[in-house]
């Protein structure tokens, strides 16, 4: 049960995130008077021994943490909505909860009893 808005958010959000955190992947911004471009250094996001740089690891952790938090929030919202819907449609009828509290109290002893009925 995927949300189409989530795909749109990922499609639009990840390039923005990459543009903002480009240096975490080893990109260097160079600006001159006549051009704007991104230049990749000779060693990109991995060092000479094949391990990722700490900035890249941090960026990956942040992205997946945000994604997990978003999925958790959406899941909890759907769960709450479903529980409210079930509570409204599949409740049980308990007439005892609708009874008045004073109805179960025995009558006080000083009340007069009605006269006894007799046969004609």
Swiss-Prot record:
One of its GO terms (molecular function) is protein domain specific binding. A motif (PDZ-binding) lies at residues 117-120. Residues 81-120 are cytoplasmic. Residues 90-99 have a biased composition (Polar residues). Residues 27-59 are extracellular. The chain crosses the membrane at residues 60-80. Preferentially expressed in epithelial tissues. Expressed at high levels in lung, kidney, and colon. Expressed at high levels in retina, colon and mammary glands. Moderately expressed in liver, spleen, pancreas and prostate. Moderately to weakly expressed in the placenta. Weakly expressed in skeletal muscle and small intestine. Residues 1-26 form the signal peptide. Its main location: membrane. GO terms for cellular component: apical junction complex; apical plasma membrane; bicellular tight junction; cell junction; extracellular exosome; plasma membrane; subapical complex. Residues 84-120 are annotated as: Interaction with EPB41L5. The keyword Signal applies. Component of a complex composed of CRB3, PALS1 and PATJ. Interacts (via C-terminus) with PALS1 (via PDZ domain). Interacts with PARD6A. Interacts (via intracellular domain) with EPB41L5. Interacts with WDR83. This is Protein crumbs homolog 3. It comes from Homo sapiens (Human). The gene is CRB3.
